[in-house]
């Protein structure tokens, strides 16, 4: 029918957790870090889900290090309560096409890690927020966090 043809010819913008195609690459790269932390929070809050979904938002070193961390928490019967707040600070292109370094302030002041009895396992003196640099890469229309060296700096 003609209505089908007109629907397929209408340009549409895909909206996802990693921004929209019309956003600048910098905005999309920053959104990838936000999406990564949202997924990590979800998996840490419900360890029964396993860590498979982390590969929807992360690859390479970042996937490995966070998968290990989540599995270690789950193995001890720990889970996360509360959500991480992520405030992107900057996105800078590297010399590799489609790759950015995103600096973001990660606020964990509302996050607790508890054991099976509900007792907090957060070390005393944990900073409420720290800035981290993430390497993010674009693959087609999707963005992935590929490197997190876990080097905390003040926000």
Give the location of each predicted region.
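Short low-complexity stretches enriched in small and charged residues
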Residues: 9-13, 20, 52-64, 90-93, ...
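Solvent-exposed loop/turn segments at secondary-structure junctions
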Residues: 61, 108-111, 152
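Core segments of small alpha/beta cavity-forming domains
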Residues: 15-80
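Primarily hydrophobic membrane-targeting regions of prokaryotic envelope proteins
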Residues: 30-44, 102-105, 133-138, 151
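Short beta-strand edge/turn micro-motifs at domain boundaries
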Residues: 101, 121-155
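Amphipathic, hydrophobic N-terminal targeting peptides for secretion and organelle import
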Residues: 1-18, 150
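Surface-exposed, charged secondary-structure patches
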Residues: 76-116
